[in-house]
């Protein structure tokens, strides 16, 4: 039985194959599942064994983005709009019922890639746009979507397609992103399995972070970001990237900044603040050899930075690694990669999974 009804912002959306259970507000709460690291969801199990899932707006906390009433049930088909949803689906052994994904051309996971190539999983996007006809044609029982696009989602809900808004990518910590598997665990009726997966990730991540605390003597300075149109875009100090750098034993140059979005600076400020940083980190999407011109995006001024001169540039190439997929459940591997960059004495024989030094 598919039962989903959601309060999204200021309006109510209903989607159900069978009528939703009534009077949920009058049901007692048996237990509350509060994430340890994630800030974007809270789950309550009610006295009738259904769940009330509250999804929070991570860009406007503590506002509620969506509230779902969920009954444990057998799902026959699911879909997702982001490649970052796929690792959660795979880890909980739900790939056999996956019928569609967004941005299928960017999928790197070999098992999902093979399903797409065989025509078993449809591409639900055209360019950067949602293909509504494909969604209706696929008609999944449940679809994991981005935390925006309310008008389209209302149409899907009216057609009986349950929509759950997933915003793991807005979490400010690596473990916060990974902990969203616990939400998927409730939806797939695999709560214990999801908790076990997350606890293993948490233990591995914290073990790596503790190695830095006990072994690293110094913390090299680090900057990151990209240059576009005369401005430098960098994550703030309260971000996923900053937390990863700090946990790896680096000192992020803007660690004290607090912002709900990227920091945007003119190049002249970066020239002052980051010119002498020990390391420069980047997320890139490049096929083929990474040249100095590609790395600096054609701006020769960057070649004068200390990090460039000493070849202390590290990067993750999203064209060659599953950074926009499996990495969400492998923060411990990303952390290990960065530790090997900043403190090679700790990981002397390290094989990078995501981040590596520019050679």
Regions found by a protein language model. Give the residues of each.
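Short glycine/proline-rich, acidic loop/turn segments that cap or connect secondary-structure elements
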Residues: 300-316
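A ligand-binding cleft/hinge motif common to bilobed small-molecule-binding domains
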Residues: 148-158, 284-296
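Bacterial Sec-dependent N-terminal signal peptides
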Residues: 1-23
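Flexible, glycine-rich surface segments
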Residues: 208-293
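A short, structured surface patch at a secondary-structure boundary
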Residues: 54-63, 70-148
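Extracytoplasmic substrate-binding proteins
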Residues: 120, 131, 137-231, 255-256, ...
């Amino acid at each position: 039985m598919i039962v989903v009804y959601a309060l999204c912002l200021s309006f109510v959306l209903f989607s159900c194959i069978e009528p939703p259970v009534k009077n949920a507000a009058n049901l007692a709460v048996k237990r509350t599942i509060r994430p340890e690291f994630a800030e974007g969801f809270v789950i309550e199990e009610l006295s009738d064994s259904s769940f009330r899932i509250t999804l929070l707006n991570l860009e406007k906390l503590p506002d509620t983005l969506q509230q779902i009433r969920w009954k444990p049930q057998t799902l026959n088909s699911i879909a997702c709009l982001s490649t970052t949803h796929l690792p959660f689906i795979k880890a909980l052994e739900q790939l056999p019922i996956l019928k569609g994904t967004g941005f299928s051309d960017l999928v790197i996971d070999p098992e999902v890639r093979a399903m797409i190539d065989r025509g078993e999983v449809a591409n639900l996007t055209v360019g950067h746009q949602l293909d509504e006809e494909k969604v209706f044609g696929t008609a999944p029982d449940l679809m994991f979507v981005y935390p925006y696009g309310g008008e389209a989602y209302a149409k899907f809900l009216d057609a009986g397609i349950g929509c759950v808004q997933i915003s793991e990518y807005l979490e400010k910590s690596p473990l916060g992103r990974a902990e969203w598997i616990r939400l998927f665990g409730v939806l797939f009726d695999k709560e214990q399995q999801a908790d076990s997966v997350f606890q293993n990730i948490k233990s591995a991540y914290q073990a790596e972070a503790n190695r830095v605390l006990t072994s690293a003597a110094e913390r090299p300075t680090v900057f990151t970001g990209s240059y576009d149109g005369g401005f430098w875009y960098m994550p703030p100090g309260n971000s996923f990237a900053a937390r990863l750098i700090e946990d790896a034993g680096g000192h992020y140059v803007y660690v004290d900044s607090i912002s709900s979005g990227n920091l945007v600076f003119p190049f002249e400020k970066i020239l002052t603040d980051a010119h002498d940083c020990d390391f420069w980190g980047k997320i890139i999407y490049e096929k083929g050899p990474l040249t100095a011109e590609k790395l600096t995006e054609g701006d020769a001024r960057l070649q004068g930075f200390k990090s460039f001169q000493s070849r202390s540039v590290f990067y993750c190439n999203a064209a060659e690694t599953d950074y926009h997929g499996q990495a969400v459940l492998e923060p411990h591997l990303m952390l290990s990669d960065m530790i090997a960059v900043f403190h090679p004495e700790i990981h002397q024989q390290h094989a990078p999974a995501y981040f590596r030094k520019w050679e």
